Structure formats: C-alpha cells, structure tokens
C-alpha cells in the first residue's frame, strides 16, 4: 500500500483504470475494499482466468475488456491519454455497445459509469477520433475475428462477441 501512495496521482489513476475492469470480471464491489485488498482481488481474478486458459484461446480474452477501443486510441496516437485512462474509456464504450446490442440494460450501463466515476476516470472518446478512423482501427485489431470483435458485458457476464455490425459502433 505504501508503494502505491508514492505514485504521482495520474500514474495511480492509470492503474485503477485496470482495476475498474475487474469489477465486471467477477470482482463485484471492489471499490468497497481498501486499495491493497482491491489489488489482491484483481491479481487473484487474473490468475484464475489465466490458469483456466493458459493459451488465450477462450475465456482469457475477457482480460481485454475495454481494450479494443483503448488499443485503437493508442494506435491513433496524439492523445494525452495513458493506457489505464484509455481502458476506462474503452470500458464505458463497450458498455454502450453492449446496451445497443441488447446485452445489458441502462442500469448496467449506469453501474459501469458509477465504477469509472468512483475512480475519477475519463469516459469519453477523444473528439478528434472520427467514427471512420475508429472503424478502420477496429478492423485491424489483432483480436478481430469475422469483422469487428469486442469483449462485451452481457447476461452471461463479460465475453467475446464477434462479427459486430459496424453500424452499431457509430
């Protein structure tokens, strides 16, 4: 815990961008735990997922929740965002896509927003990143299978969804 307290605020925020993801990967109300217990819970969740899928062929892909958009933002460059901040934006974006697809309801989107707000994380795609540019970046994502692929929340929890209609993303 003391090491975390030595980090500059923005670097700490980048780390909690990754922690926020684990709320939706089985971590529940992590924000109610002290920070050291949150980190330990995240490490345990990640270890359990990796042990169950050592070669990243299935369930392990859930660890990429929020990362499809995050990687697109990072690839586009020229934005003053760090990885954890981009992941937070990606989590909110993925929640909206899941809502549009009928996978989650407005209350679940609000839960995503609540978690991200708790950590004071950004949630909006940089304005200068156009829909056309995003679609191009999504189609080049290394995890893309049969068109646009996202890791999305849904009735069975977070899972990989392939072949998403680009119209849903605009």
What name fits each language-model region?
Residues 59-65, 81-87:
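Short glycine/threonine-rich catalytic loop with a Thr-x-Gly-x-Asp
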Residues 45-49, 72, 97:
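Alpha-helical transmembrane segments of multipass membrane proteins
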Residues 84-99:
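An active-site-proximal "capping" alpha-helix that borders the catalytic cofactor pocket
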Residues 72-81:
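Catalytic Zn2+-binding segment of zinc metalloproteases
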Residues 17-20, 103-170:
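C-terminal charged capping/lid subdomain of soluble metabolic enzymes
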Residues 1-63:
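Carboxylate- and glycine-rich phosphate/diphosphate-binding segment that chelates Mg2+/Mn2+
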Residues 67, 91, 156:
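Residue-level signal for inorganic ion chemistry
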Residues 65, 69-73:
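Active-site His/Glu-centered metal-binding helix of metallohydrolases
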